[in-house]
Amino acid sequence: EPEAPAAPEAPVATEAPVEEPVEEVVLNPYLGSNKLDGNGIPQTFFDDVHVRRAFAYCFDWDVMIDEVYMGEAIQSKVLSLPGMPGYDPDAPFYFNDLEKCAEEFKLADVDKDGVPAGEDPDDVWEMGFRVQMLYNTGNTTRQIMAEVLQANLAEVNEKFSVEILGLPWPSYLAAQRAKKIPIMTGGWLEDIHDAHNWYQPYTTGTYGARQNMPDDLKTQFKALLDQGVSLVDPAARHEVYKQFNQLYYDTVPGIPLVLATSHGYEQSWVEGRIMNPIFSGIYYRTVYKTDAAKDPTSFTDATIGDLDTLDPALSYDTSSGEVIQNIYETLVFYDGEATDKFVPQLAESWTTSDDGIVWTFNIRQGVKFHEGGDLTPTDVAYSYWRGLLQGGYSSPQWLLAEPFFGVGVDDITLLVD
């Protein structure tokens, strides 16, 4: 009897080979090679406080004040302005000292191997670096600031290379918001005339967020900010901000440069310009021409750059702000040059509760939008809600979010009636 054929063996199940996930390497175009190899810097380059101190000692304030500002500026030793809590002419500050710059670079440990760079042939002092420093095109003052730093760093060590790159204003802002810029020059136009509006943006707010400041350092700054803004006694606030000044000096998240004494210039036949430090550029409403003007019908104004946005909920740059403040009406507006006195606009009156927590604005009757609809309190409330929903550190909405949602011991309720 023929033998029955053997039953076929079932194929052995095999698992498909597991491929290791490929880690995507995202290079920053402004960091050269993105390595500590003399042709770039790693993304952690400025983590080292000695590197930050070295850069501070390499700047030359005298050159900027004497040759660029023609004497119409003073060195900024702290972030707040004269007359504000925290302003202290005796605060510790950095100054131009190329020997100290070299000392700090030799103390750095950029490759994080525990050996100071001055004793490590694979660290920044021997390897050198190449990095791009950015400014907004057309701002020659910021360009020269970068050139001063570039020249001094090259004098300290010929292997230190800073390439200066100018970007159009909107692109400059976009690069900041993308947290791509390793080192840049910037400034601040205050939102409110208060020390908090100078200390917050450079640490926990706009600039602090854009520069990837470590969370532990931001936490230290925030504790002092919350304490300072919750106090009403100027002397008590001053003591808190003095601690802030010391922390900022010790950790060097930025280098305070100069405070211009701010002169305004216009043609002799232009009158009515108001110099208020909170204005975004020029407030056109008060400006007029005398009979001496050759063309009484036109007004030409030079701004710092192209507009970024005309949405008042998102705009947080001077160029856009100048246009917005001249085409939109606000509830109240500043009274001339005063930073603490106001005149009615869309709100015909307002009251404040005894504890300062509740502010009630009475909306002017008969105001119409350009398309013909009436302005109502609901429209005003919508503007607040819309802004807060779109907020972020690159918009002005933190000015509302902090008091509305709580900072320190604040508890403010918005009433619309």
Model-flagged regions — what are they?
Residues F45-D47, E348-L399:
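Aromatic- and charge-enriched surface segment that lines or borders ligand/interaction sites
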Residues P396-D417:
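Surface-exposed binding/hinge segments that line
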Residues P21-S33, G40-E155, K218-Q220, Q243, ...:
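Append "and occasionally in soluble cytosolic enzymes with long acidic Gly/Pro-rich linkers
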Residues A54-P89, T141-A151, L173-T309, S315-I327, ...:
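Detector for C-terminal structural segments
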Residues E163-A174:
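Short helix-initiation/N-cap motifs at beta->coil->alpha
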Residues E1-V26:
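Ser/Thr-rich, Proline-interspersed low-complexity disordered segments
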Residues A302-D354, W385:
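N-terminal lobe/hinge region of extracytoplasmic solute-binding protein
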Residues M127-T137, V162-L165, D295-D306, V358-F361, ...:
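Short, well-ordered beta-strand elements
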